[in-house]
């Protein structure tokens, strides 16, 4: 039993909790720097050639589970360890401290009051009358008063003692919510072109919701850089009326526990006309080797596929650059503009179809995280409330009042308030 108590004492140590908080904060910072939940090939390709911080390559990153840090075994273990430390601290320290604060302490001898942080002795004409007067004054100021025939005890701000326990409770709820979200949360990233739909299924395979992208627009600055993306979505729940919602960056859609973020944009297709052919909508592919935001396609100019040209663009506004097989620029084409003859064929770009990058997240732990955060804030605010206590003993033989006081914070403020109370009693019964 002694060994178990020693283990509990170590686990509930404040220094350990602070160290765990710092470790979790540092790990969370790493998670915001490194890409999360990407394909393993990305980490191997990117970090084997250029190790992170010059130390950790792609293989080590996967081995340490840094590709899914927030759901990694060691990160969840840190959360569980901190939660256990907080619960033990609450059980061993905060709860007994709250119980002790709720109990009335009955001092019966003046000598006991003289040892308190604040102590005064007041001479008066009638000590019993002064005691009753002081009790009335304290009650009028919002103090709780417990009065006996020759003494009283009063206190104010006991609610402040609940604060630390609420802080611990809120942090534990927050940790549980974070762990639950990491283990049971779902995340899906998809690019949708206007008119395309995405069906979301429940675990049984039934259609739960259909998302249709009705429109997608990109707002650009004068230099052509994307400033804002906006998607108009139609939500079609089975057996219910459709809903139309608009989302943009920093303005997500929340629907039945799911959050849809406007996360990115892309180019889906280019519509071209070759000679007198009908309009052809051709899919675009990314070319990372040419740049971060470069899309293009290879277009043959002969029936046998020979003499191909490469069409590339970086914006839905164009231009579309046309390159020959030797890499030389042939021409630039504007969407909706005039066509140009390329390798003997009239080529015209009708338009470029952008795609909306949507991030869908379902995190069942969010309500617990929000509740824990709110309780933690409430507990922190209550912890700032000073708990003040006053004891008064009437000495009817010598017609004196012996007054003592304690305060857990802002002792100077209490030291200024106590003489004011004494002066009021002195005036009435001096």
Curated annotation (Swiss-Prot):
Required during biogenesis of c-type cytochromes (cytochrome c6 and cytochrome f) at the step of heme attachment. It is found in: Cellular thylakoid membrane. Keywords: Cytochrome c-type biogenesis, Membrane, Thylakoid, Transmembrane, Transmembrane helix. Belongs to the Ccs1/CcsB family. This is Cytochrome c biogenesis protein CcsB. The gene is ccsB. GO terms for biological process: cytochrome complex assembly. The chain crosses the membrane at residues 14-34, 72-92, 162-182. The keyword Membrane applies. Pfam families: ResB (PF05140). It is a multi-pass membrane protein. GO terms for cellular component: plasma membrane-derived thylakoid membrane. May interact with CcsA. Coiled coil: none annotated.
């Amino acid at each position: 039993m002694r060994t178990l108590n020693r283990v509990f004492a170590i686990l509930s140590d404040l220094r350990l909790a602070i160290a765990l908080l710092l470790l979790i904060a540092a790990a969370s910072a790493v998670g915001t720097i490194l890409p999360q939940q990407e394909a393993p090939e990305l980490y191997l390709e990117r970090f084997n050639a250029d190790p992170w911080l010059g130390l950790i390559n792609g293989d080590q990153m996967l081995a340490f589970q840094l590709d899914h840090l927030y759901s990694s075994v060691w990160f969840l273990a840190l959360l569980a360890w901190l939660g256990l430390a907080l619960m033990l601290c609450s059980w061993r320290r905060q709860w007994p401290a709250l119980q002790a604060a709720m109990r009335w302490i009955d001092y019966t001898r003046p000598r006991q009051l003289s040892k308190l942080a604040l102590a005064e002795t007041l001479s008066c004409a009638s000590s019993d009358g002064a005691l009753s007067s002081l009790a009335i004054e304290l009650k009028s100021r919002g103090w709780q008063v417990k009065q006996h025939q020759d003494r009283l005890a009063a206190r104010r701000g006991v609610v402040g003692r609940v604060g630390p326990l609420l802080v611990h409770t809120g942090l534990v709820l927050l940790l549980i919510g974070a762990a639950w979200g990491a283990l049971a949360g779902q995340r899906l990233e998809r690019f949708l072109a206007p008119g395309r739909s995405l069906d979301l299924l429940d675990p049984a395979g039934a259609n739960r919701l259909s998302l249709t992208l009705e429109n997608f627009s990109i707002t650009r600055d004068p230099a052509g850089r994307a400033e804002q993306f906006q998607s108009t979505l139609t939500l079609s729940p089975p057996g219910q009326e459709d809903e139309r919602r608009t989302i943009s960056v920093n303005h997500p859609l929340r629907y039945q526990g799911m959050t849809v973020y406007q996360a990115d944009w892309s180019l889906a297709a280019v519509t071209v006309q070759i000679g007198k052919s009908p309009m052809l909508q051709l899919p675009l592919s990314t070319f990372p080797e040419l740049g971060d935001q470069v899309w293009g396609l290879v277009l043959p100019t002969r029936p046998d596929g020979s003499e191909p040209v490469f069409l590339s663009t970086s914006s839905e506004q164009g231009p579309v650059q046309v390159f020959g097989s030797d890499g030389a620029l042939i021409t630039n084409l504007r969407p909706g503009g005039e066509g140009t003859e390329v390798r003997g064929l009239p080529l015209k770009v009708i338009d470029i179809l952008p795609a909306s990058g949507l991030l869908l997240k379902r995190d069942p732990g969010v309500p617990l995280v929000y509740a824990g955060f709110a309780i933690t804030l409430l507990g922190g605010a209550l912890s700032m409330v000073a708990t003040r206590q006053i004891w008064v003993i009437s000495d009817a033989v010598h017609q004196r009042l012996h007054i003592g006081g304690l305060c857990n914070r802002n002792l100077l403020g209490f030291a200024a308030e106590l003489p004011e109370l004494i002066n009021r009693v002195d005036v009435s019964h001096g």
